[in-house]
């Protein structure tokens, strides 16, 4: 498929720079279950769209302050380098995107505040590099936490700098496992009050972990989806989590993924019969129209970028044309887009 098939117009003023307050007051566009059916709701209305026996699947990854600013020194000359961590390789190694990468050679060192430094061990395409830090394990984690900033998406960072509000705003209610460099943004809408209302409905919940990487922000540069390569992300579904999901389905409940990260991990761990298995490892699953969903029945997600892999994913749940019509409706009704924006509840096409 052509990547241009997934393009659409989005006025820049609809890109949300701050979240709704309270979080569950964000708007929610319900798409389906009937073809072309749309309903303008609020996230606080979510319980009314759930049934007793359904199970909500959350991603409990926690965002780390993965944007670092350091200095490369070469004799008397120096250059400021922005480092965006995106994938941990070992106790002292990270994959990262560097800017400007051209100002760094192999084996050169980047110095960060607090005495932390990193050597460039490998250079790849698009500014990607392999870094080995001067600290490892928990000591490295603490140094990154002290020196780093919250890694706001580029479309927000271009408009304003990260601040103290983002430290809380860019974490979900369920954030528990440090390792993500981007938030699983559908989870940002949940509050204790909303969770209580969901529980009162007889809906169960389960948490799994997918550490979201910076690759989620990378533009698709290929012209055809067949030639696009996804960045891999680490995830885990425990035996108990898989059992809870399978039990809910066996009893007639629907699997409701909160966010595309939860959906992608579930679809990476499911077999042809629809049974979800324990999973620990990396996934680079790339879902486009024509994909047959085996694990997920309903998806709650935010509004995504034109030509992005995530807009391709939601188009696979319904159809590209139906999702374009839904997004056109959202634009006309001035829904707020992207990470801090409003939500969609998308029923899988039957």
Curated annotation (Swiss-Prot):
Q: Cite the GO molecular-function annotations of the record.
A: S-adenosylmethionine:tRNA ribosyltransferase-isomerase activity
Question: What's the Enzyme Commission number for this chain?
Answer: 2.4.99.17
* Annotated InterPro entries: QueA (IPR003699), QueA_dom1 (IPR042118), QueA_dom2 (IPR042119), QueA_sf (IPR036100)
Pathway involvement of the protein, from the record:
tRNA modification; tRNA-queuosine biosynthesis
Q: Which domain of life is it from?
A: Bacteria
The record's Gene Ontology biological-process terms are: queuosine biosynthetic process; tRNA wobble guanine modification
Localization per Swiss-Prot or TrEMBL: Cytoplasm
Q: Which reaction equations make up its catalytic activity?
A: 7-aminomethyl-7-carbaguanosine(34) in tRNA + S-adenosyl-L-methionine = epoxyqueuosine(34) in tRNA + adenine + L-methionine + 2 H(+)
The protein's UniProt keywords, in alphabetical order, are: Cytoplasm, Queuosine biosynthesis, S-adenosyl-L-methionine, Transferase
Q: Which Pfam families match?
A: Queuosine_synth
Which coarse location class describes where this protein primarily resides? cytoplasm
What's an example GO cellular component term for this entry?
cytoplasm
Subunit organization: Monomer.
Function recorded in the entry:
Transfers and isomerizes the ribose moiety from AdoMet to the 7-aminomethyl group of 7-deazaguanine (preQ1-tRNA) to give epoxyqueuosine (oQ-tRNA).
What family classification does the UniProt entry report for this protein?
Answer: Belongs to the QueA family.
HAMAP family listed in its UniProt record: QueA (MF_00113)
Per its record, how is this protein called by name? Answer: S-adenosylmethionine:tRNA ribosyltransferase-isomerase
Higher taxonomy? Bacteria, Pseudomonadati, Pseudomonadota, Alphaproteobacteria, Hyphomicrobiales
């Amino acid at each position: 498929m052509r990547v241009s098939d997934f393009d659409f117009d989005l006025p820049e003023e609809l890109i949300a720079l701050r979240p709704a307050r309270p979080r569950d007051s964000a708007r929610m566009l319900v798409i389906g279950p009937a073809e072309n059916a749309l309903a303008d709701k609020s996230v606080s209305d979510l319980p009314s769209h759930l049934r007793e026996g359904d199970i909500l699947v959350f991603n409990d990854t926690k965002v780390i302050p993965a944007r670092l600013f350091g200095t490369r020194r070469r004799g008397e000359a120096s250059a400021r380098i922005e480092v965006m961590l995106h994938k941990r390789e070992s106790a002292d190694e990270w994959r990262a995107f560097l800017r400007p990468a051209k100002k760094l050679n192999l084996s050169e060192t980047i110095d960060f505040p607090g005495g932390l430094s990193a050597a460039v061990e490998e250079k790849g395409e698009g500014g990607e590099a392999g870094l080995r830090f001067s600290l490892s394990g928990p000591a490295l984690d603490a140094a990154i936490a002290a020196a780093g900033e919250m890694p706001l998406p580029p479309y927000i960072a271009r408009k304003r700098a990260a601040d103290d509000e983002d430290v809380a705003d860019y974490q979900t209610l369920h954030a528990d496992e440090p390792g993500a460099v981007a938030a699983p943004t559908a989870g940002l809408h949940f509050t204790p009050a909303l969770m209580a209302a969901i529980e009162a409905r007889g809906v169960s919940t389960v948490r799994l972990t997918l550490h979201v990487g910076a690759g989620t922000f990378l533009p698709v540069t290929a012209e055809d989806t067949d030639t696009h390569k996804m960045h891999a992300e680490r995830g885990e579904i425990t035996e108990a989590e898989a059992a809870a999901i399978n039990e809910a389905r066996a009893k007639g409940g629907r699997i409701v993924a909160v966010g595309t990260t939860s959906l992608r991990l579930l679809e990476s761990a499911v077999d042809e019969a629809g049974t979800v298995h324990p999973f620990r490892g990396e996934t680079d699953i790339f879902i486009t129209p024509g994909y047959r969903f085996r694990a997920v029945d309903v998806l709650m997600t935010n509004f995504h970028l034109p030509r992005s892999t995530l807009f391709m994913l939601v188009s696979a749940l319904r159809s590209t044309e139906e999702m374009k019509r839904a997004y056109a409706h959202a634009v006309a009704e001035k829904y707020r887009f992207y990470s801090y924006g409003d939500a969609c509840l998308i029923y899988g096409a039957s």
